[in-house]
C-alpha cells in the first residue's frame, strides 16, 4: 500500500506540473514532435497533456473522469448478443461467447438484414438530439448501476442505441429509432459515402468535449500503475474510488475490454500513455511512417446546425487504426484496426444555428466491407442496406483519432 500511496503522490505532482500550461513542453509532447514531425498534436491531446489544475482536487475528484455521460453512439461493435456487452463483446454479467475479429458477428447471415423502410441511398441518416459515442456499448446509466432496459428513461444517453442484435422480444423500433429527448432536433449518425462530397449538407450537433481527470500521465508513472483486472482493488484504493460506484464500474469495464485476447485477423491494444499510443499505432500499421488524423471541433461543442461540405481530402490507404478514449481516472485509449475502409478529412462550414457559422474539419471513416457485420446492426436498418452492401460511414468525434500510414491527401 505504501507503494501505491507514493504513486498517488507522483500522479498528483505530475498533473500539477503539467497544469502549468505552456511554460515547458512535457516529455510526451517532445516525443510526439520528434517521431511525428509532420503531424500536429491534436487539440484534445494538448488538453490531456496540460490538464487544468481544477482536475486535481483530491483522490475522489481525481477519479471523476471514469464514468462520463452523454455518449450515445458506438461505431465499433458489430456483433450480436442478447446481453449487454463491452467493447470486445464481453457480457457485463459474465463471459458468454467468443467475439469475432473486429467485433463482427460471424454467424450465418439471415434474410432481411437491410431494413427496407430506411433511408434511400445517398441520404444521411438522422437521429434525435444527441452527440457521438464510439466505444460505449451499454449506456452511461448502466455504468452508474442504473437500468439500461429498452424504452426506459435515460437522461444521459439521448439516442440510447445498443449496437448488438436485438433480442427476440425487443422488436425493431428500439434498435432502429432513436429515443427522443430535448428539442427533438436531428443530427447525422451514419451516412452513405455519396454524402462525402462538396456541396452536400449534413446536420450535426457536437457535444462539449470531456476528458479524463488527470489527462495523460507521464509514461514512467503510467507504467508503474498496474493495469490489470486482478489489480483493480489496489488501483481503486490508489485513486480513492469506492468499489460499488459508477467510476469503479467504468474502470472495470475498461480493464476487461483491454484484456480480451487478440483474435485472428485483428490488431488491437490499449495505451496508458501518449508514447504507448504512438508506438502501438506504428506496430499495428507495420511502419514508423504514420500520421494522426483527428477532427477539428470546438471544445465547447456546437449547437445543431446544417454543415455544408466545402472540401473533401481523401486519405490514401485501405486500412487504418482507430483509437477511442476509455473510462478511467487518467487517459487510456483503446485502439483497433478498422478492417477494409476509406478515410477522408472533410471540411465543413456551419450555417450558424443562431450562434454564427463555424468551420470544422471531421475525420471520416467509411467501412467498405460489411459482409461480416451483424445483419441486425442498426446502420443497415437506418441506411436501408445490408451486410456486403454499400459502405457505412461515420465521423470521429473530438478526442478520437485515426492513424494512417504513408498518408497523402488530395482535394476531391
From Swiss-Prot:
After gene disruption, what is the outcome? Collapsed pollen with low viability. Almost no seed production.
Record carries keyword Glycosyltransferase: no
User: What's in the keyword line of the UniProt record?
Assistant: Glycoprotein, Signal
Would I find Signal among this entry's keywords? yes
- Signal peptide limits: 1-23
> Which InterPro entries does the record cross-reference, listed alphabetically?
BURP, BURP_dom
User: GO BP, one example?
Assistant: pollen maturation
Question: Where expressed (tissues)?
Answer: Specifically expressed in anthers, in the tapetum and microspores (at protein level).
Residues with attached carbohydrate: 369
One GO location term (cellular component): exine
- Pfam families found in the cross-reference section: BURP
Task: Enumerate the spans annotated as BURP domain.
Answer: 190-406
Its annotated function is as follows: Required for pollen development. Probably synthesized in the tapetum, packaged in Ubisch bodies and transported at appropriate stages to the micropsores.
What name does this protein carry?
Answer: BURP domain-containing protein 13
The species is: Oryza sativa subsp. japonica
Amino acid at each position: 500500500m505504501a507503494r501505491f500511496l507514493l504513486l498517488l503522490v507522483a500522479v498528483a505532482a505530475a498533473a500539477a506540473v503539467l497544469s502549468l500550461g505552456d511554460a515547458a513542453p512535457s516529455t510526451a509532447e517532445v516525443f510526439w514532435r520528434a517521431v511525428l514531425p509532420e503531424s500536429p498534436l491534436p487539440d484534445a491531446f494538448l488538453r490531456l497533456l496540460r490538464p487544468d489544475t481544477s482536475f486535481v482536487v483530491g483522490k475522489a475528484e481525481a477519479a471523476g473522469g471514469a464514468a462520463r455521460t452523454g455518449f450515445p453512439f458506438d461505431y465499433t461493435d458489430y456483433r450480436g448478443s442478447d446481453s449487454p456487452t463491452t467493447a470486445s463483446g464481453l457480457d457485463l454479467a459474465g463471459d458468454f461467447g467468443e467475439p469475432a475479429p473486429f467485433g463482427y458477428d460471424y454467424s450465418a447471415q439471415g434474410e432481411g438484414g437491410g431494413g427496407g423502410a430506411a433511408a434511400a441511398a445517398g441520404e444521411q441518416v438522422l437521429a434525435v438530439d444527441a452527440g457521438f459515442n464510439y466505444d460505449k456499448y451499454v449506456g452511461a446509466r448502466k455504468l452508474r448501476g442504473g437500468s439500461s432496459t429498452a424504452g426506459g428513461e435515460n437522461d444521459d444517453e439521448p439516442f440510447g442505441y445498443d449496437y448488438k442484435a436485438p433480442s427476440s422480444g425487443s422488436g425493431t423500433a428500439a434498435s432502429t429509432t432513436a429515443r427522443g429527448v430535448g428539442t427533438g432536433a436531428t443530427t447525422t449518425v451514419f451516412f452513405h459515402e455519396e454524402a462525402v462530397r462538396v456541396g452536400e449538407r449534413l446536420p450535426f450537433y457536437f457535444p462539449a468535449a470531456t476528458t479524463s481527470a488527470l489527462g495523460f500521465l507521464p509514461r514512467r508513472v503510467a507504467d508503474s500503475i498496474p493495469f490489470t483486472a486482478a489489480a483493480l482493488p489496489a488501483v481503486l484504493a490508489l485513486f480513492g474510488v469506492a468499489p460499488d460506484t459508477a467510476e469503479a464500474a467504468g474502470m472495470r469495464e475498461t480493464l476487461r475490454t483491454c484484456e480480451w485476447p487478440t483474435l485472428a485477423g485483428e490488431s488491437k491494444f490499449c495505451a496508458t500513455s501518449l508514447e504507448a499510443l504512438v508506438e502501438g499505432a506504428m506496430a499495428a500499421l507495420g511502419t514508423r511512417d504514420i500520421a494522426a488524423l483527428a477532427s477539428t471541433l470546438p471544445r465547447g461543442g456546437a449547437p445543431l446546425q446544417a454543415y455544408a461540405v466545402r472540401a473533401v481530402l481523401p486519405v490514401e490507404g485501405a486500412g487504418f487504426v482507430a483509437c477511442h478514449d476509455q473510462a478511467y481516472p487518467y487517459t487510456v485509449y483503446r485502439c483497433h484496426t478498422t478492417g477494409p475502409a476509406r478515410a477522408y478529412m472533410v471540411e465543413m462550414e456551419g450555417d450558424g444555428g443562431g450562434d454564427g457559422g463555424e468551420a470544422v474539419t471531421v475525420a471520416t471513416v467509411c467501412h467498405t466491407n460489411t459482409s461480416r457485420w451483424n445483419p441486425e446492426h442498426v446502420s443497415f436498418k437506418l441506411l436501408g442496406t445490408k451486410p456486403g452492401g454499400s459502405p457505412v460511414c461515420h465521423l470521429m468525434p473530438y478526442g478520437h483519432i485515426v492513424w494512417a500510414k504513408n498518408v497523402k491527401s488530395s482535394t476531391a
